[in-house]
Swiss-Prot record:
It holds the Pfam family Ribosomal_L4. GO terms for cellular component: ribonucleoprotein complex; ribosome. Residues 54-65 have a biased composition (Basic residues). This is Large ribosomal subunit protein uL4. Gene3D superfamilies: 3.40.1370.10. One of the primary rRNA binding proteins, this protein initially binds near the 5'-end of the 23S rRNA. It is important during the early stages of 50S assembly. It makes multiple contacts with different domains of the 23S rRNA in the assembled 50S subunit and ribosome. Part of the 50S ribosomal subunit. Residues 38-68 are annotated as: Disordered. GO terms for biological process: translation.
Amino acid sequence: MQLNVNDAQAIEVSELTFGGEFNETLVHQAVVAYMAGGRQGSKQQKTRSDVRGGGKRPWRQKGTGRARAGTIRSPIWRGGGTTFAARPQDHTQKLNKKMYRAALRSILAELVRTDRLVVVQDFAVEAPKTKDLLNKLTGMGLTDVLIVSDAVDQNLYLAARNLPHVDVRDVQGSDPVSLIAYDKVLITVSAVKKFEELLG
């Protein structure tokens, strides 16, 4: 199949990588697994046994007329422990490499099908100036965009860093969430070839 390139000839690309069907279930699974892997999972609360104190019973078992109490750190008491306290846990979900690659292929194919993939011969800025990059993107009609190249250009990265709806990634750093999060994906021809190598 062919992909149109801005201000250049169309290029021949793999049907497998850029022309497959959209597998929504697989993409959802990949996105959930990716986001779960980003969770810190370090939250921790104290149960009744973790809270300092509470060794001596507040009053004797019988004869006071009050309800029985064995410790001042009971979850019922103010200053007591938490009933079902959160514990540190690993949230990562296993996703096979073949499934992950298939999900990326599915996303790329859907970007092509919905005209959200903009292919350019090359994309760079001469100096790390946000204004220059903004003018360049505005001229192309792009406001909410992910820029993907085969290797991140330092000037481009610095210029895009302060723009809230613009991100710069290389092919290796592209993930399912970033590829679907933006209105458009601006990709260089060399990055297209790199995707074909990785996912083909």
